């Protein structure tokens, strides 16, 4: 069982999503003794944003690439392969300005690859990544779930993973974290209880 654990919060030890994503991984490991965890901190070891240079590197024949292009291709392939090798993904995904962190979006741009994680056919797009499980730790200062202001956060992630064929998607939520000490404590406690009841009991 290969677990890919991704954090994207810029808040370090003060991050709620980091704390809860660790809890999710530990809970999953406790019920899956054969688990192997690969950890990636997308904030401290950020991928560059996908660019024209990224496309040019991928489209340049191997023998014609310069060193920078080859490094770009190698980094992108390593990121994609890390995703493909994972059976379970645990993703810390805080809301920043009504969406996900740009660091997480940069990772998504490396794993949404035509011919590798999805393809187009006469019937339309087809996801190629079925069989994986994704657990998303969703945190936010406000309360946006089900509102237009939340469309670029959880709904974006749902659409992306569905597009590449992943239907086993679970959210652990701690929202309203900026509403004061008591609401924050209550939201964190509820998320921890969800982890215990849904993951430790699995």
Curated annotation (Swiss-Prot):
The keyword Chloroplast does not apply. Its cofactor is FMN. It comes from the Bacteria. Binds 1 FMN per subunit. InterPro entries: Flavodoxin_fold (IPR003680), Flavoprotein-like_sf (IPR029039), FMN-dep_NADH:Q_OxRdtase_AzoR1 (IPR050104), NADH:quinone_OxRdtase_FMN_depd (IPR023048). It holds the Pfam family Flavodoxin_2. The keyword Oxidoreductase applies. Belongs to the azoreductase type 1 family. This is FMN-dependent NADH:quinone oxidoreductase 1. It comes from Pseudomonas syringae pv. tomato (strain ATCC BAA-871 / DC3000). The gene is azoR1.
């Amino acid at each position: 069982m290969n677990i890919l654990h991704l954090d994207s919060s810029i808040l370090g030890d003060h991050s709620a999503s980091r704390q809860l994503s660790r809890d999710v991984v530990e809970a999953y490991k406790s019920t899956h003794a054969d688990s192997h965890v690969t950890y990636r901190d997308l904030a401290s070891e950020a991928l560059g944003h996908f660019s024209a240079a990224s496309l040019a590197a991928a489209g340049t024949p191997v023998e014609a690439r310069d060193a920078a292009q080859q490094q770009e291709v190698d980094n992108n392939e390593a990121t994609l392969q890390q995703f493909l090798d994972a059976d379970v993904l645990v993703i810390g995904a805080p809301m920043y300005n009504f969406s996900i962190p740009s660091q997480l979006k940069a990772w998504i741009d490396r794993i949404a690859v035509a011919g590798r994680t999805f393809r187009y056919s006469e019937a339309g797009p087809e996801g190629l990544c079925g069989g994986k499980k994704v657990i998303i730790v969703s945190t936010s200062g406000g309360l946006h779930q089900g509102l237009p202001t939340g469309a670029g956060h959880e709904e974006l992630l749902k659409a992306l993973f569905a597009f590449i064929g992943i239907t086993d998607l679970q959210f652990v939520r701690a929202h309203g974290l900026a509403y004061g000490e008591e609401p924050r404590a209550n939201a964190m406690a509820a998320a921890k209880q969800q982890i215990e009841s849904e993951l430790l009991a699995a």
